[in-house]
Swiss-Prot record:
Gene of this entry: MRPS9
Protein name: Small ribosomal subunit protein uS9m
Family: Belongs to the universal ribosomal protein uS9 family.
Gene Ontology CC entries for this record: mitochondrial small ribosomal subunit
GO biological process: translation
Annotated localization: Mitochondrion
Pfam families: Ribosomal_S9
UniProtKB keywords: Mitochondrion, Ribonucleoprotein, Ribosomal protein, Transit peptide
Length: 279
C-alpha cells in the first residue's frame, strides 16, 4: 500500500502541489484591504460615543494646558457658569442607555476646565467645541410666542379640571363675573366654588379689579369652578408675566390631573369590597 502511494506521488508534478499557496496569499491580502474599520477609535470601549467626546475634549485641554486658567477668589454666580446639556439631553449623543452618571460628571468637569481658560488666551476652537455642549433652552425661550392682550384689552386663557373645560376673558374692571351668561352667584350656589374662582385674585390682592367672563362646559359644578380658577390664573400671567412665580407657588397655575378612580368588577366602589362572609 505504501509503495502504491509513493508511486502516485512520483506521478503528480510538484507544481500541482504548490499552486494553492499564491492564491491563499492573494486572498488574505484582499480580506485585509476590505476589512471594515470602525468609525470611532473608541469602538471597543463600553461607551464609544462618550469616550470619543472625552478624547476630543481632553486632547483640546492638553493642547491648551500651558495657558493659565482664571483664578477667581470669590465663588462664581449661577449666571457665570454655562448651562451645559442635561443628563438626558447629553444621553442622546453620548451613548443613550450606556451613559452613566459618573461619565456625565466627568464630562461636566472637563467642560468647566475648558471654560475656565482666560478669554484673552482662548480661541475660536475652544468656543466652537463648548458651544456644542451648551443647552439650547435659552434659544428656544426666545422663539416662544408670548400671548398678548387683544385689541379690546382682554386676556384670554383656557383652563381644565377633570372633564370640565373653561375659556375665560379677563379685563380690568369693577369685579363683575359672568359664567355662561349668568351671574356669578346664580351659577354657583356653593360658597366654596365661588371662593375657588376668586382665589387667584386674592393671592395678588386684586379682587374687584378685573371683570371675568367665562364659558364653561362639561363635568360637575366643582370641576367647572376649578377649571375657571385655572383659566383666571393663566389670564393674569398674560397681563403681567412677573406674577407667574407668585401664582405658581400658590398652586393655581398647575393643572390638577386627579380623576375619580373607576369602579372595579366585584367591588362596591373603586376599592371598597363587600363584607367577607365565611359561609
Amino acid at each position: 500500500m505504501f509503495a502504491r502511494m509513493a508511486s502516485l506521488r512520483a506521478l503528480v508534478p510538484v507544481r500541482a502541489l504548490l499552486w494553492r499557496a499564491p492564491v491563499r496569499s492573494v486572498h488574505r491580502a484582499a480580506v485585509r484591504e476590505t476589512r471594515i474599520v470602525p468609525q470611532l477609535p473608541t469602538f471597543y470601549s463600553a461607551n464609544p460615543a462618550h469616550e470619543a467626546h472625552m478624547d476630543r475634549l481632553e486632547a483640546l485641554l492638553r493642547k491648551h494646558t500651558k495657558q493659565q486658567a482664571r483664578r477667581v477668589a470669590v465663588e462664581r454666580t449661577a449666571s457665570d457658569r454655562p448651562r451645559w446639556l442635561s443628563f438626558d439631553q447629553y444621553a442622546l449623543i453620548g451613548g443613550t442607555s450606556r451613559l452613566k452618571p459618573t461619565q456625565y460628571r466627568q464630562l461636566v468637569s472637563v467642560l468647566d476646565r475648558l471654560h475656565a481658560i482666560d478669554p484673552q488666551l482662548s480661541n475660536g476652537e475652544i468656543a466652537a467645541t463648548l458651544e456644542a455642549f451648551l443647552r439650547k433652552s435659552r434659544l428656544e425661550e426666545q422663539n416662544v410666542v408670548r400671548q398678548e392682550l387683544d385689541h379690546l384689552g382682554r386676556a384670554c386663557a383656557v383652563g381644565r379640571r377633570k372633564t370640565s373645560s373653561a375659556k375665560v376673558w379677563l379685563v380690568r374692571g369693577s369685579g363683575e363675573v359672568l359664567v355662561n351668561g349668568r351671574t356669578f352667584a346664580d351659577y354657583f350656589s356653593k360658597i366654596k366654588d365661588r371662593d375657588a374662582i376668586m382665589y387667584p385674585l386674592r393671592v395678588l390682592d386684586a379682587a374687584g379689579k378685573y371683570n371675568i367672563f367665562a364659558a364653561v362646559r362639561g363635568g360637575g359644578v366643582t370641576g367647572q369652578a376649578e377649571a375657571i380658577m385655572h383659566a383666571v390664573a393663566k389670564a393674569l400671567v398674560v397681563f403681567n408675566p412677573l406674577l407667574k412665580t407668585r401664582l405658581h407657588r400658590a398652586g393655581v397655575l398647575t393643572r390638577d390631573y386627579r380623576h375619580v378612580e373607576r369602579k372595579k368588577p366585584g367591588k362596591r366602589k373603586a376599592r371598597k369590597m363587600p363584607a367577607w362572609v365565611k359561609r
